[in-house]
Amino acid sequence: MLCFIGNTSLVTALGNECDTIHAIENNQSGLYYSEKYNAVVGEIPARAFDNITSKVNFTKFESLIIQNIKNVLPTENDIDDDTLLVISTTKGNVHLLENNTAVIDNNCFLYTSAIKIADYLKFKRKPIVISNACISGVSAFVVAKNLMSSDDTIKNVVVVGCDILSEFIVEGFRSFKSLSNKPCKPYDANRDGLSLGEACGAVLLTKDINLASKPLIALKGGAVTNDANHISGPSRTGDGLYYAMKEALNDAEVLGADVKYVNMHGTATLYNDEMESKAIQWSCLSNVPVNSFKGYIGHTLGASGVVETILCIYQMRNNIVFATKGFEKRGTPCKLNVSDANRLYTDVNICLKTASGFGGCNAAIVLVKNPVNAYNNAEKPNASIGGEDNIKVLAQYSLPNSSECFSDFIRKEYKQLNLSYMKFYKMSDLSKALFIASENIIRQCPEIVNANPRRVAIIMSNKVSSLEADIQHQQIVDKHLEEGASPAIFVYTLPNVAVGEVCIKNKIKGDNTFFIENFNTGLSEYYAKQLLRLNKADFVICGWCDKEIASEMPMDESQINANSDLEKMNGINKDNNWNVNLKILSK
């Protein structure tokens, strides 16, 4: 079964899809110094998107997604129930917290926005939301392909990625001292940091060759891995990304020697670009053309994987590899075939696209032009897909209920485990809750301890994402302190970092995907089973890790003070009302 690329649409700091491609072809950048952010950024020009917010109360984030989805839908008629919407984002409408952390706007909840969008466009299926740091967009393609491969009822998937600039994001990256004061220079000897951008991109994936754009390009392989090394820095060896690349190629049944082009994350930070060069060397791809788009449009976070894949698709269809803007002289320890000029080739028919992010996550996908047997894409019965397939529940665990405040309760739970792991005390509450639950369930399952770490996956979901850490970070940002924001807090403003902590402690290096939904529908367990059925894991830890919401309605100061001992604030009940339920599945 092949997943073909259908219509595509994007908007970046350079404009819409046509404008963006034309600018890149002509070596033009959309990055500029912004007085608002006191940083070099790439903002979407107002002319580049339809402002429908005034009509139906959509935010800029939601408007961009709606516009780009409309552009890729094959028909204006009703969307069939065989079409799924997958949204990737890191922070969604987090800008709504600015100077407003005493009230929690419902649109701060990622799935609330997703439902608004899906209902407005009349999708019949409930959307899927992925928040996996900077690999979110590439991860969304991996999830979409896996679901299309294992679920006969899904014929089409609209994959859309979007993130917009905000003080929240800019000050967070500034706290890590990772922003350049000039347009970024990926892979260059003089690179000194990244440039942030905003964007939205959408792609129609389809099993129907009649809906595929020509020449045909198929999403043939994909994989997600974890470094199990550090929550805010990449593996210094490049092994985590290498294994994502290797597994994506294996999934696509493509040899590394056949890859014609690699589009890397290429953020222009010292460690990221260094790590990527090592992963390229591990993969024996040092002579294959490589590029990064960050010098044109900036790092667009959860949108980057989708937007950059669309640019890869254009290059494949036109047999060109665009220049890496800002690159002059290679400054990576291992060889990379990077150029400051556009390069034409006879046939760019196989592309490997990668991404890496906080929490140690890595992802890669493989695109193939004019794949063999493209016109014989009938779905074949596969006994491994249907039924329960002897999938077993090896262990279950739920974090106990307690009337104690969470900080006291979780410390006692930690001490009962007789651990000596000082990192625990620096974690966010979300990370602590998942960490303790994971330690308990793994102790029930000795098989997982001795398993191949690359064959162990963690699939999680929740509603609030990382809202507590978001509020803490935003409150610091709102004060405009001379010392700036705290990197120790900002790093936890991504829900998948909680999974990353578990991966680091237990050396788990397989798939690590984090879904967002309004309540526990069993999505994480459903997807875990698909990974097992597709033979992409031997063991999967899956479940729900969330904090119950005391109120999603605005709360004034008197209401906050009235909550017991100030334990309820910002719309979130700070008592021990965590809901953490885990399972370990295996075949």
Residue map of PLM features:
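Conserved "HGTGT" condensation-loop signature of ketosynthase/thiolase-family condensing enzymes
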Residues: M1-P127, N146, S166, S175-S195, ...
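A short, small-residue-rich loop immediately preceding and capping a beta-strand
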Residues: I130, K155-G161, V540-W544
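Short, thiol/selenol-centered motifs that function as redox-active sites or metal-ligating centers
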Residues: C134
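Short conserved active-site loop signatures built around small residues
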Residues: G137
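Active-site alpha-helical elements of protease catalytic centers
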Residues: A140-F141, L204
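Phosphate-binding/catalytic loop of phosphoryl-transfer enzymes
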Residues: L147, D151-N156, G161, N535-K536
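Short beta-loop-alpha junction of Rossmann-like oxidoreductase domains
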Residues: I169
